[in-house]
A protein has these predicted regions:
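Soluble ligand-binding/transfer domains with enclosed cavities or grooves
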Residues: 6-11, 29, 39, 44, ...
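Hydrophobic beta-sheet segments that form the core/acyl-binding groove
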Residues: 67-115
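Segments adjacent to and within acyl-thioester-processing domains across lipid
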Residues: 114-161
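Active-site loops and adjacent core secondary-structure elements that bind or stabilize anionic groups
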Residues: 1-2, 113
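Active-site helix/loop of acyl-thioester processing domains in fatty-acid/polyketide metabolism
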Residues: 31-60
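Catalytic strand-loop segment that frames the active site of acyl-thioester-processing enzymes
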Residues: 4-32, 159-161
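Short, basic/aromatic beta-hairpin or loop at an interaction surface
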Residues: 60-67
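Short helix/loop capping segments that flank catalytic or ligand/cofactor-binding pockets
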Residues: 19-23, 100-101, 117-120, 127
Length: 161
């Protein structure tokens, strides 16, 4: 069920030449990776869903892009050490409530007022992050290490005595 058909979020970053990502992208051509701009947009979308109250009844859940949808990402500019400001904008098109709340939005990043990144109708959803089924070896290891259980609140711990 669609509960909202529009919304807006804006985030700004003052760019400094000493930011961590400049040294790690292109040799002798420092810039922010376009994938990092996209990740910042996804984080802003996640914040929007969380601020809308969708995480309150879903403790332990996480955000992920909707994998079944194709996305067209356009990088047309760069954030460089001489840039002054990166602005990330999320133009919410639709918020769908249901078993997995989903947000659909257009994304735009501008650098010093010039369009640098655009993505049309990107979707992010809130999904359970438990039980841990993706890495059964971690579950087995945790079950075998009863010291952690006893120390941090499991059966036989100081907290339950």
């Amino acid at each position: 069920m669609c509960i909202r058909d529009s919304g807006y979020l804006r985030a700004e970053l003052d760019v400094r030449p000493d930011l961590w990502f400049f040294d790690g992208h292109f040799k002798n051509d420092p810039c922010m990776p376009g994938t990092l701009m996209f990740d910042g947009c996804l984080q802003a979308m996640s914040f929007y869903l969380a601020a809308s109250g969708f995480t309150l009844p879903r403790d332990g859940w996480r955000f992920r892009p909707v994998a079944e949808l194709p996305y067209q990402l356009q990088c047309r500019g760069q954030v460089t050490p001489s840039s002054r400001r990166l602005v990330t904008e999320v133009f919410v098109e639709e918020v769908v409530d249901g078993p997995f709340p989903t947000l659909f939005a257009d994304l735009l990043c501008t650098v010093d007022g010039l369009k640098a990144f655009h993505a049309r109708r990107v979707a992010i959803e809130l999904v359970p992050d438990w039980p841990l089924e993706a890495m059964p070896a971690l579950l087995a290891e945790a079950a075998a290490d009863t010291r952690l259980m006893k120390r941090y609140g499991g059966p036989g711990s100081r907290a339950t005595r």
